[in-house]
Amino acid sequence: MQYLGEVISLVVACSWTVTALFAEIGSKRLGSLQMNVIRMLLSLLMLGATLWWFTGSPFPLYADGKAWFWLSLSGFVGYLLGDYCLFNSYIWIGSRFGQLFMTLAPPTAALAGWIMLGETLSWNALLGMMVTLTGIGISVLNKGTTNKLSLKLPLKGVLFGIGAGVGQGIGLVLSKVGMTCYEVSIPASEEVVSDLMPFASTFIRAVTGAVGFLCVMGFQKQFHTLVTSARDRKGMNAALWATITGPFIGVSLSLTAVQYTEAGIASTLMALTPIFIIWPAHLLFNQKVTFKEVIGACISVIGVSLFFI
């Protein structure tokens, strides 16, 4: 089928849009920490079942100490820090603006790759960073009565949004290091294990995320809140669907998309979530959407696309 990869990439963007909407609902009903714990545990069950079905083991095969270290570190930064900030941003500024700040992930990943891995930082990447930041600025800044620029969103929500994008970007680079180590440790004859390496890597990251969130919950003495959360049917349904459409369907389809089209095209189309989420967020949460915010979201996505040209 012609343009199959492009179609799948658009489906991924839609899937992540649905994930963000359900995550906002779940976070507001259950709490960001509770939502993250439940989502991580559900992710482990789904990923473990997938690995078991195809490889005969629910746990990552052939992953050595180096792979576990780097992928666990990636899970700590990307899930424990990044997702904690992301889900809190949903509570403070909503999933629409939360996803807008996630466009900071590609520039952060580019900078982290340059610093940590010695990767080349092209002029397109630098331009993409400036365009992305401009788009975010257009969306979240207003001129006050004194004609001075000011935030139109709660500062705490903006900081959580920035933390989410930065955490996601750094976590991505650490994940790349971990997957490189993992790939070397898999025997050439184990093609199935090699094909499922992204799922196994996500499993390792999710283990760190789940353990980390449970430790935070224990430190804050909030284990009892999981019982209360389990009784909230709407909140639990939101957590379930956020897990299915995000870590499970979103990840699997994103891996499939790059098999049928160029990675740059797939990445750009999958980055359309900040635009796709505008109308559903307006309908579901009665959020007022201005023309300037739509333009800002479009500019941010254009900035992201420059990283892949």
Task: Explain the meaning of each model-derived region.
Residues 41-46, 101-115, 130, 208, ...:
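Alpha-helical transmembrane segments of compact multi-pass small-molecule transporters, enriched
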Residues 1-14, 107-166, 170, 176-177, ...:
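Juxtamembrane helix-loop boundary signature in multi-pass membrane transporters
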Residues 74, 119-132, 196-209:
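Alpha-helical transmembrane segments
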Residues 1-15, 20-34, 38-73, 83-93, ...:
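Membrane-interface interhelical linkers
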Residues 86-105, 114-121:
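Membrane-interface helix-loop-helix junctions at boundaries between adjacent transmembrane segments
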Residues 11, 38-39, 101-104, 123-127, ...:
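Hydrophobic core positions of alpha-helical segments in small-molecule transporters
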